[in-house]
Curated annotation (Swiss-Prot):
The chain crosses the membrane at residues 42-62, 70-90, 97-117, 134-154, 179-199, 207-227, 230-250. It is found in: Cell inner membrane. The Tat system comprises two distinct complexes: a TatABC complex, containing multiple copies of TatA, TatB and TatC subunits, and a separate TatA complex, containing only TatA subunits. Substrates initially bind to the TatABC complex, which probably triggers association of the separate TatA complex to form the active translocon. It comes from Halothiobacillus neapolitanus (strain ATCC 23641 / c2). GO terms for cellular component: TAT protein transport complex. Belongs to the TatC family. It comes from the Bacteria. This is Sec-independent protein translocase protein TatC.
Length: 366
Protein backbone atom coordinates (compact mmCIF):
# COMPACT_ATOMS: atom_id res chain seq x y z
CA UNK A 1 0.00 0.00 0.00
CA UNK A 2 1.38 3.40 -0.96
CA UNK A 3 1.61 6.08 1.66
CA UNK A 4 -0.65 9.09 1.26
CA UNK A 5 1.16 12.35 0.65
CA UNK A 6 0.12 14.62 3.53
CA UNK A 7 2.16 17.66 2.54
CA UNK A 8 0.38 21.06 2.41
CA UNK A 9 0.91 21.30 -1.36
CA UNK A 10 -0.69 17.89 -1.89
CA UNK A 11 -3.66 18.83 0.30
CA UNK A 12 -4.06 22.07 -1.61
CA UNK A 13 -3.95 20.32 -4.97
CA UNK A 14 -6.40 17.69 -3.74
CA UNK A 15 -8.81 20.38 -2.57
CA UNK A 16 -8.52 22.12 -5.92
CA UNK A 17 -9.32 18.86 -7.71
CA UNK A 18 -12.37 18.29 -5.50
CA UNK A 19 -13.60 21.83 -6.11
CA UNK A 20 -13.16 21.43 -9.86
CA UNK A 21 -14.89 18.05 -9.93
CA UNK A 22 -17.89 19.15 -7.85
CA UNK A 23 -18.43 22.34 -9.87
CA UNK A 24 -17.98 24.66 -6.87
CA UNK A 25 -15.31 26.82 -8.49
CA UNK A 26 -17.82 29.40 -9.70
CA UNK A 27 -19.57 29.57 -6.32
CA UNK A 28 -16.30 29.98 -4.44
CA UNK A 29 -15.26 32.64 -6.92
CA UNK A 30 -18.41 34.62 -6.11
CA UNK A 31 -17.71 34.28 -2.38
CA UNK A 32 -14.16 35.56 -2.86
CA UNK A 33 -15.46 38.47 -4.92
CA UNK A 34 -18.06 39.30 -2.25
CA UNK A 35 -15.40 39.19 0.46
CA UNK A 36 -13.16 41.56 -1.50
CA UNK A 37 -16.02 44.01 -2.06
CA UNK A 38 -16.96 43.96 1.63
CA UNK A 39 -13.35 44.52 2.66
CA UNK A 40 -13.09 47.50 0.33
CA UNK A 41 -16.26 48.99 1.81
CA UNK A 42 -15.07 48.48 5.39
CA UNK A 43 -11.68 49.99 4.56
CA UNK A 44 -13.34 53.02 2.98
CA UNK A 45 -15.46 53.61 6.09
CA UNK A 46 -12.43 53.13 8.33
CA UNK A 47 -10.33 55.63 6.37
CA UNK A 48 -13.13 58.22 6.52
CA UNK A 49 -13.54 57.58 10.23
CA UNK A 50 -9.84 58.22 10.86
CA UNK A 51 -10.00 61.42 8.81
CA UNK A 52 -13.09 62.72 10.64
CA UNK A 53 -12.09 61.63 14.15
CA UNK A 54 -10.11 64.82 14.98
CA UNK A 55 -13.24 66.85 14.08
CA UNK A 56 -15.70 64.79 16.17
CA UNK A 57 -16.66 67.66 18.48
CA UNK A 58 -17.15 70.05 15.58
CA UNK A 59 -19.40 67.48 13.90
CA UNK A 60 -21.60 67.25 16.98
CA UNK A 61 -21.78 71.04 17.26
CA UNK A 62 -22.91 71.27 13.63
CA UNK A 63 -25.47 68.49 14.15
CA UNK A 64 -26.86 70.19 17.27
CA UNK A 65 -27.14 73.59 15.59
CA UNK A 66 -30.84 73.23 14.56
CA UNK A 67 -31.72 72.51 18.21
CA UNK A 68 -29.33 75.04 19.77
CA UNK A 69 -30.86 77.92 17.83
CA UNK A 70 -34.30 77.19 19.32
CA UNK A 71 -33.31 76.48 22.90
CA UNK A 72 -34.23 79.06 25.55
CA UNK A 73 -31.55 81.47 26.69
CA UNK A 74 -29.23 79.91 29.21
CA UNK A 75 -30.24 76.32 28.37
CA UNK A 76 -27.70 73.77 27.21
CA UNK A 77 -27.70 70.09 26.34
CA UNK A 78 -26.71 67.64 29.05
CA UNK A 79 -24.97 64.26 29.27
CA UNK A 80 -26.81 61.85 31.54
CA UNK A 81 -24.25 59.06 31.36
CA UNK A 82 -20.66 59.45 32.48
CA UNK A 83 -19.04 58.32 29.21
CA UNK A 84 -21.51 60.08 26.90
CA UNK A 85 -19.30 63.14 26.21
CA UNK A 86 -16.71 60.79 24.67
CA UNK A 87 -18.77 58.02 23.07
CA UNK A 88 -21.53 60.14 21.53
CA UNK A 89 -19.15 62.18 19.29
CA UNK A 90 -17.34 58.94 18.50
CA UNK A 91 -20.60 57.31 17.41
CA UNK A 92 -21.50 60.38 15.38
CA UNK A 93 -18.14 60.21 13.60
CA UNK A 94 -18.71 56.57 12.64
CA UNK A 95 -22.22 57.32 11.34
CA UNK A 96 -20.90 60.28 9.36
CA UNK A 97 -18.23 58.08 7.78
CA UNK A 98 -20.88 55.57 6.69
CA UNK A 99 -23.09 58.40 5.42
CA UNK A 100 -20.31 59.84 3.28
CA UNK A 101 -19.22 56.41 2.02
CA UNK A 102 -22.68 55.48 0.71
CA UNK A 103 -21.81 56.19 -2.96
CA UNK A 104 -18.69 54.03 -2.72
CA UNK A 105 -20.62 51.25 -0.96
CA UNK A 106 -23.30 51.32 -3.65
CA UNK A 107 -20.62 51.19 -6.32
CA UNK A 108 -19.13 48.07 -4.70
CA UNK A 109 -22.58 46.50 -4.68
CA UNK A 110 -23.05 47.44 -8.31
CA UNK A 111 -19.63 46.03 -9.29
CA UNK A 112 -20.53 42.73 -7.61
CA UNK A 113 -23.89 42.20 -9.32
CA UNK A 114 -23.11 43.78 -12.72
CA UNK A 115 -21.34 40.73 -14.26
CA UNK A 116 -24.49 38.65 -13.75
CA UNK A 117 -26.78 41.10 -15.55
CA UNK A 118 -27.66 41.44 -19.21
CA UNK A 119 -26.52 44.44 -21.18
CA UNK A 120 -29.90 46.18 -21.12
CA UNK A 121 -30.16 45.50 -17.37
CA UNK A 122 -26.77 47.10 -16.76
CA UNK A 123 -27.88 50.15 -18.70
CA UNK A 124 -30.93 50.37 -16.44
CA UNK A 125 -29.37 49.65 -13.05
CA UNK A 126 -26.56 52.20 -13.29
CA UNK A 127 -28.91 55.24 -13.55
CA UNK A 128 -31.10 53.79 -10.80
CA UNK A 129 -28.14 53.44 -8.43
CA UNK A 130 -27.02 56.99 -9.20
CA UNK A 131 -30.51 58.44 -8.74
CA UNK A 132 -30.99 56.47 -5.51
CA UNK A 133 -27.83 58.00 -4.06
CA UNK A 134 -28.86 61.53 -5.03
CA UNK A 135 -32.36 61.08 -3.62
CA UNK A 136 -31.01 59.70 -0.35
CA UNK A 137 -28.80 62.75 0.15
CA UNK A 138 -31.68 65.04 -0.80
CA UNK A 139 -33.85 63.39 1.84
CA UNK A 140 -31.19 63.87 4.50
CA UNK A 141 -30.69 67.51 3.47
CA UNK A 142 -34.45 68.09 3.56
CA UNK A 143 -34.53 66.72 7.11
CA UNK A 144 -31.64 68.90 8.29
CA UNK A 145 -32.55 72.21 6.66
CA UNK A 146 -36.36 72.04 6.66
CA UNK A 147 -37.69 69.50 9.14
CA UNK A 148 -35.30 69.99 12.07
CA UNK A 149 -35.79 73.76 12.47
CA UNK A 150 -39.57 73.42 12.36
CA UNK A 151 -39.75 70.41 14.68
CA UNK A 152 -37.27 71.77 17.26
CA UNK A 153 -38.86 75.21 17.19
CA UNK A 154 -42.19 73.61 17.99
CA UNK A 155 -40.91 71.19 20.65
CA UNK A 156 -38.86 73.81 22.50
CA UNK A 157 -41.94 75.98 23.11
CA UNK A 158 -44.61 73.30 23.48
CA UNK A 159 -43.75 72.35 27.07
CA UNK A 160 -44.76 74.06 30.31
CA UNK A 161 -42.98 77.32 31.10
CA UNK A 162 -41.59 76.06 34.41
CA UNK A 163 -39.82 73.07 32.78
CA UNK A 164 -36.17 73.55 31.88
CA UNK A 165 -35.62 72.34 28.30
CA UNK A 166 -32.25 70.49 28.41
CA UNK A 167 -32.14 67.47 26.05
CA UNK A 168 -29.65 64.64 26.54
CA UNK A 169 -26.98 64.38 23.87
CA UNK A 170 -27.47 60.61 23.50
CA UNK A 171 -31.22 60.91 22.99
CA UNK A 172 -30.71 63.80 20.60
CA UNK A 173 -28.27 61.81 18.45
CA UNK A 174 -30.69 58.86 18.26
CA UNK A 175 -33.54 61.24 17.36
CA UNK A 176 -31.78 63.04 14.52
CA UNK A 177 -30.12 59.87 13.18
CA UNK A 178 -33.49 58.12 12.86
CA UNK A 179 -34.92 61.15 11.05
CA UNK A 180 -31.92 61.39 8.73
CA UNK A 181 -32.18 57.80 7.55
CA UNK A 182 -35.99 57.84 7.55
CA UNK A 183 -36.16 60.81 5.20
CA UNK A 184 -33.31 59.42 3.12
CA UNK A 185 -35.14 56.15 2.49
CA UNK A 186 -38.51 57.86 2.03
CA UNK A 187 -37.05 59.90 -0.81
CA UNK A 188 -36.44 56.60 -2.64
CA UNK A 189 -40.17 56.31 -3.43
CA UNK A 190 -39.78 57.39 -7.10
CA UNK A 191 -37.08 54.77 -7.64
CA UNK A 192 -39.28 52.07 -6.11
CA UNK A 193 -42.22 53.06 -8.32
CA UNK A 194 -40.11 53.04 -11.49
CA UNK A 195 -38.70 49.62 -10.62
CA UNK A 196 -42.18 48.18 -10.05
CA UNK A 197 -43.31 49.49 -13.44
CA UNK A 198 -40.21 48.23 -15.26
CA UNK A 199 -40.47 44.77 -13.73
CA UNK A 200 -44.14 44.60 -14.70
CA UNK A 201 -45.68 44.33 -11.24
CA UNK A 202 -47.92 47.36 -11.80
CA UNK A 203 -48.75 49.87 -14.50
CA UNK A 204 -48.95 53.67 -14.22
CA UNK A 205 -52.72 53.51 -14.59
CA UNK A 206 -53.01 51.13 -11.65
CA UNK A 207 -50.77 53.37 -9.58
CA UNK A 208 -52.96 56.35 -10.44
CA UNK A 209 -56.02 54.43 -9.26
CA UNK A 210 -54.16 53.51 -6.07
CA UNK A 211 -53.56 57.18 -5.19
CA UNK A 212 -56.06 57.43 -2.32
CA UNK A 213 -54.58 54.39 -0.62
CA UNK A 214 -51.07 55.76 -1.18
CA UNK A 215 -51.98 58.90 0.76
CA UNK A 216 -53.20 56.81 3.68
CA UNK A 217 -50.08 54.62 3.58
CA UNK A 218 -47.90 57.76 3.52
CA UNK A 219 -49.36 58.97 6.81
CA UNK A 220 -49.02 55.50 8.34
CA UNK A 221 -45.35 55.30 7.33
CA UNK A 222 -44.74 58.80 8.68
CA UNK A 223 -46.37 57.86 11.99
CA UNK A 224 -44.08 54.83 12.30
CA UNK A 225 -40.80 56.46 11.27
CA UNK A 226 -41.11 59.84 12.94
CA UNK A 227 -41.24 60.70 16.64
CA UNK A 228 -44.69 60.82 18.27
CA UNK A 229 -45.65 64.34 17.25
CA UNK A 230 -48.12 65.40 14.59
CA UNK A 231 -45.90 68.06 13.06
CA UNK A 232 -43.05 65.75 12.11
CA UNK A 233 -45.59 63.25 10.81
CA UNK A 234 -47.02 65.84 8.42
CA UNK A 235 -43.51 66.97 7.50
CA UNK A 236 -42.77 63.45 6.27
CA UNK A 237 -46.16 62.45 4.85
CA UNK A 238 -46.39 65.43 2.49
CA UNK A 239 -43.03 64.72 0.79
CA UNK A 240 -44.00 61.07 0.42
CA UNK A 241 -47.18 62.05 -1.41
CA UNK A 242 -45.31 64.50 -3.64
CA UNK A 243 -42.63 61.91 -4.39
CA UNK A 244 -45.34 59.37 -5.21
CA UNK A 245 -46.78 61.72 -7.80
CA UNK A 246 -43.31 62.44 -9.17
CA UNK A 247 -42.55 58.73 -9.44
CA UNK A 248 -45.89 58.16 -11.17
CA UNK A 249 -45.07 60.89 -13.68
CA UNK A 250 -41.61 59.49 -14.45
CA UNK A 251 -42.83 55.89 -14.62
CA UNK A 252 -45.08 56.71 -17.58
CA UNK A 253 -42.02 57.45 -19.72
CA UNK A 254 -40.36 54.20 -18.69
CA UNK A 255 -43.58 52.30 -19.37
CA UNK A 256 -43.86 53.76 -22.88
CA UNK A 257 -40.22 52.89 -23.56
CA UNK A 258 -40.85 49.35 -22.31
CA UNK A 259 -43.83 48.92 -24.64
CA UNK A 260 -41.87 50.32 -27.58
CA UNK A 261 -38.97 47.93 -26.90
CA UNK A 262 -41.35 44.97 -26.67
CA UNK A 263 -42.94 45.98 -29.98
CA UNK A 264 -39.51 46.19 -31.64
CA UNK A 265 -38.55 42.74 -30.39
CA UNK A 266 -41.82 41.29 -31.64
CA UNK A 267 -41.37 42.95 -35.02
CA UNK A 268 -37.82 41.60 -35.31
CA UNK A 269 -38.98 38.09 -34.46
CA UNK A 270 -41.84 38.21 -36.97
CA UNK A 271 -39.53 39.65 -39.65
CA UNK A 272 -37.01 36.89 -39.08
CA UNK A 273 -39.79 34.34 -39.36
CA UNK A 274 -40.93 35.84 -42.68
CA UNK A 275 -37.38 35.88 -44.07
CA UNK A 276 -36.80 32.26 -43.21
CA UNK A 277 -40.27 31.03 -44.13
CA UNK A 278 -39.24 29.43 -47.47
CA UNK A 279 -36.29 27.64 -45.95
CA UNK A 280 -38.40 26.51 -43.00
CA UNK A 281 -41.07 25.11 -45.32
CA UNK A 282 -38.48 23.21 -47.37
CA UNK A 283 -36.94 21.82 -44.21
CA UNK A 284 -40.35 20.70 -42.97
CA UNK A 285 -41.11 18.98 -46.27
CA UNK A 286 -37.81 17.10 -46.17
CA UNK A 287 -38.48 16.10 -42.57
CA UNK A 288 -41.96 14.84 -43.40
CA UNK A 289 -40.64 12.83 -46.36
CA UNK A 290 -37.99 11.20 -44.18
CA UNK A 291 -40.61 10.31 -41.58
CA UNK A 292 -42.91 8.87 -44.26
CA UNK A 293 -40.09 6.73 -45.66
CA UNK A 294 -39.26 5.47 -42.18
CA UNK A 295 -42.90 4.59 -41.54
CA UNK A 296 -43.05 2.78 -44.89
CA UNK A 297 -40.08 0.63 -43.88
CA UNK A 298 -41.39 -0.14 -40.42
CA UNK A 299 -44.01 -2.85 -41.41
CA UNK A 300 -41.27 -5.10 -42.82
CA UNK A 301 -39.51 -5.10 -39.50
CA UNK A 302 -42.81 -5.63 -37.71
CA UNK A 303 -43.66 -8.69 -39.83
CA UNK A 304 -40.29 -10.19 -39.05
CA UNK A 305 -40.79 -9.58 -35.36
CA UNK A 306 -44.28 -11.09 -35.54
CA UNK A 307 -42.96 -14.23 -37.30
CA UNK A 308 -40.28 -14.66 -34.66
CA UNK A 309 -42.84 -14.27 -31.87
CA UNK A 310 -45.16 -16.80 -33.56
CA UNK A 311 -42.33 -19.34 -33.86
CA UNK A 312 -41.52 -18.92 -30.19
CA UNK A 313 -45.18 -19.41 -29.31
CA UNK A 314 -45.35 -22.66 -31.34
CA UNK A 315 -42.29 -24.00 -29.56
CA UNK A 316 -43.77 -23.20 -26.17
CA UNK A 317 -47.09 -24.86 -27.04
CA UNK A 318 -45.29 -27.94 -28.36
CA UNK A 319 -43.35 -28.29 -25.13
CA UNK A 320 -46.53 -27.79 -23.10
CA UNK A 321 -48.45 -30.48 -25.07
CA UNK A 322 -45.59 -32.95 -24.70
CA UNK A 323 -45.49 -32.48 -20.92
CA UNK A 324 -49.31 -32.81 -20.57
CA UNK A 325 -49.74 -36.03 -22.69
CA UNK A 326 -46.90 -37.96 -21.07
CA UNK A 327 -44.57 -40.52 -22.67
CA UNK A 328 -47.35 -43.09 -23.45
CA UNK A 329 -49.43 -40.76 -25.56
CA UNK A 330 -46.34 -39.64 -27.41
CA UNK A 331 -45.44 -43.31 -28.20
CA UNK A 332 -48.99 -44.07 -29.36
CA UNK A 333 -48.97 -41.05 -31.56
CA UNK A 334 -45.70 -42.14 -33.21
CA UNK A 335 -47.03 -45.73 -33.98
CA UNK A 336 -50.11 -44.45 -35.81
CA UNK A 337 -50.02 -44.64 -39.60
CA UNK A 338 -49.55 -41.26 -41.19
CA UNK A 339 -50.27 -39.65 -37.85
CA UNK A 340 -48.14 -37.08 -36.14
CA UNK A 341 -48.69 -35.77 -32.66
CA UNK A 342 -50.61 -32.54 -32.62
CA UNK A 343 -48.49 -29.53 -31.86
CA UNK A 344 -51.40 -27.13 -31.61
CA UNK A 345 -49.83 -24.76 -34.10
CA UNK A 346 -51.82 -22.28 -36.07
CA UNK A 347 -52.32 -22.66 -39.80
CA UNK A 348 -49.72 -20.77 -41.77
CA UNK A 349 -52.38 -19.05 -43.87
CA UNK A 350 -54.15 -17.63 -40.81
CA UNK A 351 -51.55 -15.71 -38.89
CA UNK A 352 -54.18 -13.73 -36.96
CA UNK A 353 -56.30 -16.71 -35.87
CA UNK A 354 -56.32 -17.49 -32.14
CA UNK A 355 -53.80 -20.09 -31.15
CA UNK A 356 -55.64 -23.23 -29.99
CA UNK A 357 -54.48 -26.86 -30.16
CA UNK A 358 -56.08 -28.66 -33.13
CA UNK A 359 -58.34 -31.66 -32.20
CA UNK A 360 -57.00 -35.23 -32.70
CA UNK A 361 -58.34 -37.26 -35.62
CA UNK A 362 -60.16 -40.56 -34.86
CA UNK A 363 -58.09 -43.73 -35.22
CA UNK A 364 -58.40 -45.24 -38.68
CA UNK A 365 -59.76 -48.86 -38.80
CA UNK A 366 -57.18 -51.61 -39.09
Amino acid sequence: MTERDSSPEADKNGLADVVEETGMAGFLGHLVELRNRLLKGVLAVLVLFLILFPFRNELFTMLADPLSRHMPAGSTMIAVEVASPFFIPLKLTALTAVFIAIPFLLYQLWAFIAPGLYKHERKLVAPLVFSSTILFYLGAAFAYFVVFPVVFGFLSTAGPSDVNFAPDIGEYLSFVTSLFFAFGFVFEVPVAIVLLVIVGVVTPDKLAGFRRYAILIAFIIAAILTPPDVLSQFMMALPIIMLYEFGLFVSRFFYKAKLARAAEVEAEESGAADDESDEAVSARHAEYEAKAQTQADEPLDMDKAFDEAEADQRRLESDSSASDDGPESNTAGRTEEGEQPSTGSKPEDEPNAPSEPSPKKPDSPV
